[in-house]
Amino acid sequence: MAIILGVDPGSRITGYGVIQCQGRQQLYLGSGCIRTSGDDLPLKLKQIFDGISEIIRQYQPDEFAIERVFLAKNADSALKLGQARGAAIVAATVANLPVAEYSATQIKSAVVGTGRAKKEQVQHMIQQLLKLPAAPQADAADALGVAVCHYHTNQSLVALSGRATTRTYGRYR
């Protein structure tokens, strides 16, 4: 059984999603957004760090996964996003959590089946996969998608490692 905290970083809104995984079952524990205020970037980074630290204290996750920085047309936006990611990653590292990173394409592929999925498709699939009564808000759905992607990636690696070492009747299983 593992509790996974997924994070969709942003300098204004950072989404988070927490799931519990046991076997093939994924259970929704919580999600939401950390909304930063003001124009002072160092203060925003502290708000992200404090918010993620509080979520870690509340849910006690075993693993932490975050979306990788994409290439933005605006260099300033990409730098701010990278700094927001850094604040979240430091919070996870301070809590001694292993950190995994996934691209937006990997996340969308794991959740929807295509790396070109739209936000609405991700929201809908997260609602279906986690059996939620309503679709979560976009940033929270993206963060839950990060957690689901991490779970599926780990499941695939476990399955592959098991197959590579099990040999029966001259064939690998």
Curated annotation (Swiss-Prot):
Binding, Mg(2+) 2: E67
UniProt keyword annotation of Transferase present: no
Superkingdom: Bacteria
Keyword field contains Metal-binding: yes
Gene Ontology cellular component terms for the protein in this record: cytoplasm; Holliday junction resolvase complex
Cofactor: Mg(2+)
Catalytic activity field: Endonucleolytic cleavage at a junction such as a reciprocal single-stranded crossover between two homologous DNA duplexes (Holliday junction)
InterPro entries according to UniProt: RNaseH-like_sf, RNaseH_sf, X-over_junc_endoDNase_Mg_BS, X-over_junc_endoDNase_RuvC
Active-site residues from the entry: D8, E67, D139
EC number(s) stated in the UniProt entry for this protein: 3.1.21.10
Example of a GO MF term: magnesium ion binding
GO-annotated biological processes: DNA recombination; DNA repair
EC category name: hydrolase
Principal location listed in the UniProt entry: cytoplasm
Subcellular location per the Swiss-Prot or TrEMBL entry: Cytoplasm
Keyword set, alphabetical order: Cytoplasm, DNA damage, DNA recombination, DNA repair, DNA-binding, Endonuclease, Hydrolase, Magnesium, Metal-binding, Nuclease
Pfam families, per the entry: RuvC
Cofactor annotation comment: Binds 2 Mg(2+) ion per subunit.
Binding site for Mg(2+) 1: D8, D139
Family: Belongs to the RuvC family.
Quaternary structure and partners: Homodimer which binds Holliday junction (HJ) DNA. The HJ becomes 2-fold symmetrical on binding to RuvC with unstacked arms; it has a different conformation from HJ DNA in complex with RuvA. In the full resolvosome a probable DNA-RuvA(4)-RuvB(12)-RuvC(2) complex forms which resolves the HJ.
HAMAP family named in the record: RuvC (MF_00034)
Primary role: The RuvA-RuvB-RuvC complex processes Holliday junction (HJ) DNA during genetic recombination and DNA repair. Endonuclease that resolves HJ intermediates. Cleaves cruciform DNA by making single-stranded nicks across the HJ at symmetrical positions within the homologous arms, yielding a 5'-phosphate and a 3'-hydroxyl group; requires a central core of homology in the junction. The consensus cleavage sequence is 5'-(A/T)TT(C/G)-3'. Cleavage occurs on the 3'-side of the TT dinucleotide at the point of strand exchange.
Protein name (Swiss-Prot/TrEMBL): Crossover junction endodeoxyribonuclease RuvC
Lineage: Bacteria, Pseudomonadati, Pseudomonadota, Gammaproteobacteria, Alteromonadales
